[in-house]
Regions:
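Short, basic, glycine/proline-bearing loop/turn elements
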Residues: 58-65, 78, 156-163, 208-209
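Short leucine-rich amphipathic alpha-helical surface patches
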Residues: 178, 190-193, 227-234
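Phosphate/ribose-phosphate-bearing ligand recognition and processing surfaces
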Residues: 193-212
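A structural signal for short, well-ordered beta-strand segments and their strand-loop junctions
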Residues: 152, 186-190, 238-242
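Metabolite-binding pocket within alpha/beta catalytic cores that recognizes anionic/polar moieties
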Residues: 2-6, 10, 40-124
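Acidic/Gly/His-enriched mid-domain segments of enzyme catalytic cores or analogous surface patches
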Residues: 85-86, 94-184
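N-terminal donor/sugar-recognition subdomains of glycan-related enzymes
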Residues: 1-61, 71-76, 205-210, 216-244
Length: 244
């Protein structure tokens, strides 16, 4: 999705959630400054190092969300030849993958997941796409320097080293990242778009699952709409395991 197309979505999201464009831009500037000082990846670097070199120029991707179906879908995916797929995890899904001894190739995160697991995945080779927005300035400042192999994104107009490929939540941003990296086939695991959340997306809940709050429910509605945009406007073959 190009930035002009995204702008319409972005304005709607700002109005619907009461978010601040200025807050997003402030955090984007902070993330860009940190990455400028520490060094960061370009989208070309990410493609060359992960898609082209590590995964032999595959055009197949698996996107892992943190929905209730995630563990069931991981069991299905264990039967795939994962050498043929780029694995992109949305933030909290990383924990579930580590529990099954799977290291994602790329993690899309706004750094609000289980930090110890994110650091473990990074130390074991996972690349990071770190997203700055108005509500995570503190996490960006605290944790960005702790990660290696980082590409930065924003949901506002890109500045400096940052990109905006489209997408709002970690899961749908992972989908749009896959498209930017050349996806022709995209398997979705743990992408439920429902009203139930898991401990992987909300570590503070009691038990394995719980009801999504109003904000989370609205975010998941946008995530599903953004998936539908992909289905309607691209030629990517999307296989959602929730339908299997």
């Amino acid at each position: 999705m190009d930035i002009n197309e995204w702008e319409g979505w972005y304005v709607e999201i700002l109005e619907d959630f009461g978010f601040s464009r200025e807050g997003d831009e402030k955090t984007a500037d902070l993330l860009d400054k940190i990455l400028e000082e520490k060094g960061c990846l370009t989208i070309g670097d990410l493609y060359n190092e992960v898609v082209y070199t590590k995964k032999k120029d595959t055009d197949k991707f698996i996107i892992f969300g943190a929905g209730p179906s995630l563990k069931k879908h991981i069991e299905i995916i264990k039967n795939y030849n994962l050498d043929n797929y780029v694995l992109i995890a949305a933030d909290g899904a990383t924990t579930a993958l580590l529990e099954e001894d799977i290291i994602p190739d790329i993690i899309a995160t706004d750094v609000d997941g289980k930090i110890s697991d994110l650091l473990t995945a990074n130390a074991n080779g996972a690349y990071f796409v770190i997203h700055g927005h108005g509500n995570n300035e503190e996490n960006i400042e605290m944790w960005t320097d702790s990660f290696n192999k980082v590409l930065g994104t924003t949901q506002s107009i890109p500045v400096g080293n940052l990109y905006n490929f489209g997408g709002f939540t970690d899961g749908d941003r992972a989908m749009y990242l896959a498209i930017e990296l050349g996806a022709n086939e995209m398997v979705l695991a743990g992408m439920d778009f429902g009203t139930i959340v898991t401990k992987y997306s909300r570590p503070d809940i009691e038990g394995e699952t719980g009801p999504a709050d109003e904000i989370k429910t609205k975010k998941l509605i946008y995530a599903e709409r953004l998936l539908n945009w992909i289905l309607e406007n691209t030629d990517v073959n999307v296989i959602n395991l929730i339908d299997s």
